[in-house]
Amino acid sequence: MNCTKGGGFPLLFCAVICLMAQQGACNVVLIANNTTLSFDDVEATFTPEVKDSGVNGAIYAVEPLDACSPLRKKAANGPVSPFALVIRGGCQFDDKVRNAQNAGFKAVIVYDDEDSGVLVSMAGSSSGIYIYAVFLSKASGEVLKKYSGQSDVEVWILPVYENSAWSIMAISFTSLLAMAAVLATCFFVRRHQIRRDRGRIPVTREFHGMSSQLVKAMPSLIFTKVQEDNSTSSSCAICLEDYSFGEKLRVLPCRHKFHATCVDMWLTSWKTFCPVCKRDASAGTSKPPASESTPLLSSVIHLSAESTALSSFRSTVAVSPPRPIRRHPSSQSTSRAYSISSAPRNYNLQRYYTNSPYISTSRSNVDLANMSSQWSHTPHQASMHSLRSGHLSLPINIRYTIPHVSRSDYGSASLGLSHDSCSHHGSPSYYHSSLGQQRSYLMHRTESGPSLSTMVLQSPQ
């Protein structure tokens, strides 16, 4: 049943109303001596409508009674219009009316040949027909037939407007009920089809967010005042509203803060990462969050700088040839290494990184040559002799730690690399400083053992 194709229903509805309105449009009234009879009739659809004042005449039964052939008797001319009484059957309604019209009758009354009690609306071709025609029941036709040919009997065909109005109202109400029933049927059928189709298609739900239990487990706080300097410390990045005193804030693993209601809706309904830094909110806090003070690429740059500085230092020590170094007259063999233990630890390392080669903060073994074995077996005088003659061939195994700053007796800052030694003889240390011109310092052995301690300044040539 296709309910969408109902374009012809309004036309059919109007046609039914017109036909049913004409069914109660007229009444046949018989007036005889002290007798008045009224019969219900239905007007034909192919003949002219009865005038408002109605028409009257005398009734005559024709021969043949079915009027399917030309009538044997013509209508008599007189002051009263002749009406032909015809029985149903044998031919079409328009043929009966046309034969009666040709015989001179002014109206045709057709009665049913069966006692069905149903009045029909006669249909046919209206070509060349200008007289009136109505349809009666079989009982009404038998009564009229008794008064056929009597000149003192008068028959009226009158329109009945009251019956027509009530019929239109009844038909309209019935038609509206039928239309409502059809529409309701279509609605329920369509609804049933949609439910059936939904049952056939597998339901696939796409999960976008986190579970509410996991979101509620994240830490939260009550806002009192701005305590940090970042993009989410004073306002919510989701609703763009400033925090108010007493509001509940949710803290994500990346340390960004939001309104609890805003970020809970974001994490459970949309995405599982931070709206600011795009970090997964379900992951743990293994590293500090990226902010203005800790850029995203800081760790990468730090690691690459360490590896570059270490490789550069190794290549420099291995390739550079020995240089002659003269001992400064003011330095003594009994001098001690400059103390660097009192240097502050919170020194700004950025200045050192930009002005001097970077040395890895991790412990590294730098092999300068096989220096330790010769250094331990060679006397102090031989060591100084080799240093004066320009041969720095004694190898040292040094472990470097984080560089720090000390102040020498000359007033200039020196950057030192301390050495962690496992032997009881001490540890060699290497120091470097700048006094405005090319200088180099030599750390050489003291009484404490095989360590380079005294810094010897080479005079410029």
From Swiss-Prot:
Topology of this chain in the membrane? Single-pass type I membrane protein
The UniProt entry, under Gene3D superfamilies, shows: 3.50.30.30, Zinc/RING finger domain, C3HC4 (zinc finger)
Span-the-membrane segments of this chain are 168-188
ZnF bounds (RING-type): 236-278
Cytoplasmic compartment: which residues?
189-461
Annotated PA domain residues = 67-147
Region feature Disordered, mapped onto this chain: 319-339
Coarse class of the primary localization is membrane
Q: Which cysteines are joined by disulfide bonds?
A: C68-C91
Q: Which UniProt keywords apply?
A: Disulfide bond, Glycoprotein, Membrane, Metal-binding, Protein transport, Signal, Transmembrane, Transmembrane helix, Transport, Vacuole, Zinc, Zinc-finger
Matches recorded under InterPro entries:
E3_ligase_sorting_rcpt (IPR051653), PA_dom_sf (IPR046450), PA_domain (IPR003137), Znf_RING (IPR001841), Znf_RING/FYVE/PHD (IPR013083), ZNRF4/RNF13/RNF167_PA (IPR044744)
- Give the signal sequence positions: 1-26
> Some GO term, biological process aspect, for this entry: which one?
ubiquitin-dependent protein catabolic process
Q: State its role.
A: Involved in the trafficking of vacuolar proteins. May function as a sorting receptor for protein trafficking to the protein storage vacuole (PSV).
Q: Quote the protein name from its UniProt record.
A: Receptor homology region, transmembrane domain- and RING domain-containing protein 2
Q: Which organism is it from?
A: Oryza sativa subsp. japonica (Rice)
Q: Which gene encodes it?
A: RMR1
